[in-house]
Amino acid sequence: MATKCGNCGPGYSTPLEAMKGPREEIVYLPCIYRNTGTEAPDYLATVDVDPKSPQYCQVIHRLPMPNLKDELHHSGWNTCSSCFGDSTKSRTKLVLPSLISSRIYVVDVGSEPRALKLHKVIEPKDIHAKCELAFLHTSHCLASGEVMISSLGDVKGNGKGGFVLLDAETFEVKGTWERRGGAAPLGYDFWYQPRHNVMISTEWAAPNVLRDGFNPADVEAGLYGSHLYVWDWQRHEIVQTLSLKDGLIPLEIRFLHNPDAAQGFVGCALSSTIQRFYKNEGGTWSVEKVIQVPPKKVKGWLLPEMPGLITDILLSLDDRFLYFSNWLHGDLRQYDISDPQRPRLTGQLFVGGSIVKGGPVQVLEDQELKSQPEPLVVKGKRVAGGPQMIQLSLDGKRLYVTTSLYSAWDKQFYPDLIREGSVMLQVDVDTVKGGLKLNPNFLVDFGKEPLGPALAHELRYPGGDCSSDIWI
């Protein structure tokens, strides 16, 4: 699925070339059973998304992991567009770190893309011994022939934002990317851009704080993150810490795809803001708030005010549109970022959420809506939960969405999601004027899985996508 080229490596030469890539036909996504009451391992599902296929919207393969309660979460590749110039590299393995068990699974997606096989299991003890890290999150491939995985904590569940390095051929644990003793206080996501000698990482909370659910007292106690860490890419050390105003729980971070661009965006979940980070003329980095989703005053909920809870963000490959999900309020949003300092709302669509009519929550004061949104019903299925993980087609015309965040928080905020399972939906995107419209004929119902309702999470295409591939 690479650009046509006589001597090319994986992926595409540029983000704009990637936009010309083939339409997605299958999608991989992890399905979680931890906290659901079903004593079964998490598994990697393969879903057919080709409208011409007789198996359209069906799970066509399930690869169960050999252990229980891993909490599969995010995934990355053995190699991607960062290695486009190396014809010896090919995108054949999907790397799945486990958020809770700290196990890493390497899945063979190259031999038979529609019938995946487990290639290797990296046990937690190997990571603990060589890296003193645990609770693993984001996986990115590097042009150096390595895979880099971020951590949330140490072996005891205290906060520690470090990075595990794997050999991308043998998948042996090589050690940490950062210098010994140089980890950030907390960790979560990261994105690198070698042209500017920079990596920036984000932070959630220590594993001991978030493992079993959300306690508002932990926010008051300052146990949740509110910083970005700027790293020197060549020296592997933190050179700047950016404190975020109105930036509690900065989660997903995205540089612009154009590797010359020295700016990007991060979604701050609890504050429900989008912050733009950028490089100054002097070479240091700054951050500014560019979008604020106002909280809603409510009755019948955990707190008197409900944040949107921005949990995932994406940038289209042409760096024109930014998308994000408000998991609690229930809406997906599209912003035109042609002027990155002044994003302009161009599309909004409600996909479930906590404030739907007829639910337990009453909205008392709302700065944005005149009435509470209707519950979403697709093909007879009432959608539980709210929009969470999102993935955009290469051409930018289709947005896929799942509804599970993290099993412990799902159980707390959306107990019906545990009972009924999550769903995968597809939204049609207007890339000319802007706009979002639900495809009423698309539904993958993970409530009907053979072993019981499952929680489906992050989406990946076999040929790469706009949140896994980094151009250098």
Swiss-Prot record:
It is found in: Nucleus; Cytoplasm, Cytosol; Membrane. Catalyzes the oxidation of methanethiol, an organosulfur compound known to be produced in substantial amounts by gut bacteria. Selenium-binding protein which may be involved in the sensing of reactive xenobiotics in the cytoplasm. May be involved in intra-Golgi protein transport. It catalyses: methanethiol + O2 + H2O = hydrogen sulfide + formaldehyde + H2O2 + H(+). Keywords: Acetylation, Cytoplasm, Membrane, Nucleus, Oxidoreductase, Phosphoprotein, Protein transport, Selenium, Transport. The modification Phosphoserine is found at residues 111, 371, 467. It is a peripheral membrane protein. The keyword Cytoplasm applies. Its EC number is 1.8.3.4. Interacts with USP33. Pathway: Organosulfur degradation. Belongs to the selenium-binding protein family. This is Methanethiol oxidase. InterPro entries: Se-bd. The N-terminus is blocked. GO terms for biological process: protein transport. It is an enzyme of class 1 (oxidoreductase). The modification N-acetylalanine is found at residue 2. GO terms for molecular function: methanethiol oxidase activity; selenium binding. GO terms for cellular component: cytosol; membrane; nucleus.
